[in-house]
C-alpha cells in the first residue's frame, strides 16, 4: 500500500538481535492519524487520503480549518498531510476513521520524510565539504574562502547553482529504503533502522518505499 502515517521522532536507541548484534534504531511515536478527507478523481482530479494528527488550541484554528475538521468529525490537528491512493486502494477508508502503525509490518522497507536540522548561514567548508586553503605559506586571509567562482570575460557570469556559502539545513529531506525493525501497536511506536531526518520531537512521515 502507498498509505503511510505521520509521527514524531522520539529519539534513537539500540536493540539487539538474537545473534547479539546491536542495531541503531530511531523510535517514532505515531498517534492514530485521523482521516479528515478522502479525495476522489471526480471532485479533486486525483485519489488521496488526507490525515491530521496531534491537537491544536481552538484559538489557533481559523474558521476554514475548523469547518474542515468539523465536517469530518475529527479534532483539529497540528497540520494536514496527504497520501496518494492507487486505483482500488483505500476502499475501506472513510472520513473520521483512523490510520495506525498497524498499516506497517516488521521487516517492511519504508521512506522517511522530515525537516532537517537548521544550521543557519554556513560557509562552503561546512555546507559543501570544500577543502580548506593553506593555513600558512603566505595565506593570511583566505583559509576558508571558496576560491574562484567563475572564469573570465567568457562566460562573464557565475553559473546558477554554484555551491557557495548560504543557509544550511531546515529543508525537507527524504531518506529512502529504511527497514522497520519492530512495530509496537500497543504503544503506537515504530522502530526504524538507522537515522531519520530532523530533530527530536519533529514531525516525520513514514510511507512505503518507492524504490524497494
Swiss-Prot record:
GO molecular function terms listed in the Swiss-Prot or TrEMBL record: rRNA binding; structural constituent of ribosome
GO terms classed as biological process: translation
Pfam families: Ribosomal_L3 (PF00297)
Annotated positions of the N5-methylglutamine modification: 153
Post-translational modification: Methylated by PrmB.
Domain of life, per lineage: Bacteria
Keyword Ribonucleoprotein: yes
GO CC list: cytosolic large ribosomal subunit
Keyword Ribonucleoprotein set for record: yes
Listed InterPro entries: Ribosomal_uL3, Ribosomal_uL3_bac/org-type, Ribosomal_uL3_CS, Transl_B-barrel_sf
Record's keyword terms, sorted: Methylation, Ribonucleoprotein, Ribosomal protein, RNA-binding, rRNA-binding
Function of the molecule: One of the primary rRNA binding proteins, it binds directly near the 3'-end of the 23S rRNA, where it nucleates assembly of the 50S subunit.
HAMAP family: Ribosomal_uL3_B (MF_01325_B)
Membership in a protein family: Belongs to the universal ribosomal protein uL3 family.
Oligomeric form and interacting partners: Part of the 50S ribosomal subunit. Forms a cluster with proteins L14 and L19.
Protein's name in the database: Large ribosomal subunit protein uL3
Gene name per UniProt: rplC
Amino acid at each position: 500500500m502507498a498509505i503511510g502515517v505521520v509521527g514524531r521522532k522520539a529519539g534513537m536507541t539500540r536493540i539487539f538481535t538474537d545473534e547479539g548484534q546491536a542495531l541503531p534504531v530511531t523510535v517514532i511515536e505515531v498517534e492514530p492519524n485521523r482521516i479528515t478527507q478522502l479525495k476522489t478523481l471526480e471532485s479533486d482530479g486525483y485519489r488521496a487520503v488526507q490525515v491530521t494528527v496531534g491537537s491544536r488550541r481552538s484559538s489557533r484554528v481559523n474558521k476554514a480549518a475548523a469547518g474542515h475538521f468539523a465536517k469530518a468529525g475529527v479534532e483539529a490537528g497540528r497540520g494536514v498531510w496527504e497520501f496518494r491512493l492507487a486505483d482500488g486502494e483505500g476502499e475501506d477508508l472513510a472520513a473520521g476513521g483512523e490510520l495506525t502503525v498497524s498499516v506497517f509490518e516488521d521487516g517492511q522497507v519504508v521512506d522517511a520524510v522530515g525537516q532537517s536540522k537548521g544550521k543557519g548561514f554556513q560557509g562552503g567548508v561546512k555546507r559543501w565539504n570544500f577543502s580548506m586553503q593553506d593555513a600558512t605559506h603566505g595565506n593570511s586571509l583566505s583559509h576558508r574562502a571558496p576560491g574562484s567562482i567563475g572564469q573570465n570575460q567568457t562566460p562573464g557570469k557565475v553559473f546558477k547553482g554554484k555551491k557557495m556559502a548560504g543557509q544550511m539545513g531546515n529543508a525537507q529531506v527524504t531518506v529512502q529504503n529504511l527497514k522497520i525493525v519492530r512495530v509496537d501497536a500497543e504503544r503506537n511506536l515504530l522502530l526504524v533502522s538507522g537515522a531519520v531526518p530532523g530533530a527530536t520531537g519533529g514531525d516525520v512521515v513514514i510511507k512505503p518505499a518507492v524504490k524497494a
